[in-house]
Amino acid sequence: MAPKAVLVGLPGSGKSTIGRRLAKALGVSLLDTDAAIEQQAGRSIAEIFATDGEEEFRRIEEEVVRAALVDHDGVLSLGGGAVTSPGVRSALDGHTVVYLEISAAEGVRRTGGSNVRPLLAGPDRAEKFRALMSQRIPLYRRVSTIRVDTNRRNPGAVVRYIMSRLDDPTPNTSPSSTASGAAT
């Protein structure tokens, strides 16, 4: 058993929204690893970060992701930082991994004043977001088999594009404006 698609991307890229819609379109369930971590730990991610630190959170996250890659056959949505773990990156080999791309400005706008993202908490959110981008974008690109730009695109268009790629899994760098129906 393996997921139909694994979604990765920065906070605000649409992993939860696209994940729900993609799962519905495929007729499968969605597993959000952040929610699974909270359920397993009995605490919020922010609490885990505050009490145990990021290193312990990443250890738990890798455990949850590895199990989900074996046990879940629907759509799997990973937390934005999951790819920072070499173990997670290794576990993603051979899976269909969809990287939801987003600009810094759009990511900051979409995440707004959210308190559920510990690495973006506090002042200078735009600067923190750009730092996450520089660290994580190369990792997302390394693990992805499908890339889709989510900037200024409605979720339905993103899901349709992903569905077309799942039907034709040839390597991809980014949708063209004609394939996506949106200017890039």
Curated annotation (Swiss-Prot):
Chain sites annotated for binding ATP: G12, S13, G14, K15, S16, T17, R117, R153
Subcellular locations according to the entry: Cytoplasm
Reactions mediated catalytically: shikimate + ATP = 3-phosphoshikimate + ADP + H(+)
Domain of life: Bacteria
InterPro entries: P-loop_NTPase, Shikimate/glucono_kinase, Shikimate_kinase/TSH1, Shikimate_kinase_CS
Positions that bind Mg(2+): S16
Composition-biased stretches (Low complexity): 169-184
Disulfide linkage: none
HAMAP family, sorted: Shikimate_kinase (MF_00109)
Protein name, as recorded: Shikimate kinase
Biological source species: Mycobacterium ulcerans (strain Agy99)
Taxonomic lineage from the root: Bacteria, Bacillati, Actinomycetota, Actinomycetes, Mycobacteriales
Name of the coding gene: aroK
